[in-house]
Curated annotation (Swiss-Prot):
Identification of the protein by name: Hemoglobin subunit alpha-A
CDD domains assigned to the protein according to its UniProt record, in alphabetical order: Hb-alpha-like
Gene3D superfamilies membership: Globins
GO cellular component: blood microparticle; haptoglobin-hemoglobin complex; hemoglobin complex
Keyword presence, Iron: yes
Pfam families: Globin
Tissue: Red blood cells.
InterPro entries per record: Globin (IPR000971), Globin-like_sf (IPR009050), Globin/Proto (IPR012292), Hemoglobin_a-typ (IPR002338), Hemoglobin_oxygen_transport (IPR050056), Hemoglobin_pi (IPR002339)
Taxonomy of the source species: Eukaryota, Metazoa, Chordata, Craniata, Vertebrata
């Protein structure tokens, strides 16, 4: 459960990276594909090379979903309901992949803004990304 301080820290991170969120989303995907090659199986029709327009496009969607979640941090389930349905019912993405992408997103934030990711910010951001993953996998049952 995210505390009020956690929510404030998460909102602060996204306020600082807002203009770069799409780039961060694409970078996180690239890192996930490189580090966890099994995740590529969900994108057989994509050019997965570095700087690929398709990866950038999907990174934009990832960023938009995270921004939507931040903007509705008190109702993550409501904000991400359609996305949860899509991933559970149609795409059937392995739930572990959300955790992997979240970890890659943390790495991107850390490398892009090392001073931003203090322990006081890292823990709430990790909790938030885990909460997003939990919501996205809630409809798998």
């Amino acid at each position: 459960v995210l505390s009020p301080a956690d929510k404030s820290n998460v909102k602060g991170v996204f306020a600082k990276i807002g203009g770069q969120a799409e780039e961060y989303g694409a970078d996180a995907l690239e890192r996930m594909f490189a580090t966890y090659p099994q995740t590529k199986t969900y994108f057989p029709h994509f050019d997965l090379g570095k700087g690929s327009a398709q990866v950038k496009g999907h990174g934009k969607k990832v960023a938009a979903a995270l921004v939507e979640a931040v903007n509705n941090i008190d109702d993550l389930a409501g904000a991400l309901s359609k996305l949860s349905d899509l991933h559970a019912q149609k795409l059937r993405v392995d739930p572990v992949n959300f955790k992997l992408l979240g970890q890659c997103f943390l790495v991107v934030v850390a490398t892009g803004n090392p001073a931003l990711l203090t322990p006081e910010v890292h823990a709430p951001l990790d909790k938030f990304l885990c909460a997003v993953g939990t919501v996205l996998t809630a409809k798998y049952r």
